[in-house]
A protein has these predicted regions:
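Generic, well-ordered alpha-helical scaffold segments in large soluble proteins
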Residues: 34-37, 136, 171, 196, ...
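Glycine-enriched alpha-helix->loop->beta-strand junction motifs that scaffold or abut catalytic
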Residues: 43, 114-116, 140-142, 170-174, ...
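Hydrophobic faces of well-ordered beta-strands that scaffold small-molecule active sites
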Residues: 8-16, 22, 45-49, 81-88, ...
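Alpha/beta catalytic barrel-like cores
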Residues: 12, 19-30, 34-61
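N-terminal amphipathic alpha-helix/helix-capping segment at the start of soluble metabolic enzymes
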Residues: 1-21, 69-74
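Active-site beta->alpha loop and helix N-cap motifs at the rims of alpha/beta catalytic domains
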Residues: 36, 51-169, 183-186
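Catalytic alpha/beta core domains of metabolic enzymes, predominantly
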Residues: 181-209
């Protein structure tokens, strides 16, 4: 879409259904059937296909998560729609720290599976947990989208977030995601933050999640 002479691209993210009740957790055969319908809609430049809880659900169904990711990303790759994954930085796809060599290998595997972008976040916005993953993703040929986890407090100011973004961009992240997980981001603050980042780094893509 074009608004005010700016191109706006939409990314389809429906990750939370993987973490909801069992009846909403899709099997790989269901994902493969829904992919053509998503493509036919013609409005998404990106689709989230794995990461976070995805692989865990595949395992619960007794499916091979590697085959599942390849099968789901393939139709999007074929038509030029970028695919992306969720990555918990130091914790990779888990809920606890993962060794550096395993995380480095994970990005190579994900790239081979057809995944283009990794959205890297740390709930504490700790750059030491995010920056290594940025470097591993770049080494593997993926696009690292570094994330700012949004909240509201006297500490979490525009300048605070802009400073974190500066560090992540300096580390090599070509994209920044404003991850408003709790839905408490204030429009005025988010607007000022976006403007500040774009003024400092005009070439950087910003996504709101």
């Amino acid at each position: 879409l074009t608004a005010m002479k700016k191109e706006i691209k939409f990314s389809l993210v429906y990750r939370d259904m993987w973490q909801s009740s069992g009846k909403y957790q899709p099997r790989v055969d269901q994902l493969v059937r829904i992919a053509p319908l998503i493509i036919e809609m013609g409005c998404f430049a990106r689709v989230e296909t794995n990461g976070g809880a995805f692989e865990q659900v595949n395992l619960l169904y007794g499916e091979n998560p590697n085959k599942a990711v390849r099968a789901f990303t393939k139709p999007f790759n074929e038509v030029g729609i970028q695919t992306h994954m969720l990555d918990r930085g130091l914790n990779a796809l888990r809920m606890y720290p993962v060794p550096a060599d395993v995380r480095r290998l994970m990005y190579r595997v994900k790239h081979a599976q057809g995944v283009d972008i990794t959205r890297i976040f740390c709930g504490l916005n700790e750059t030491r947990n995010i920056i290594p993953s940025i470097k591993y993703a770049l080494e593997a040929g993926m696009i690292p989208q570094a994330t700012l986890c949004i909240t509201h407090s006297p500490v979490h100011t525009v300048e605070y977030y802009a400073h974190v973004a500066d560090q992540l961009i300096e580390a090599g992240a070509p994209e920044i995601c404003l991850k408003d997980m709790a839905g408490i981001g204030r429009p005025g603050m988010l607007g000022r933050l976006t403007k500040t980042i774009k003024e400092r780094h005009p070439e950087v893509i910003i996504q709101y999640h």
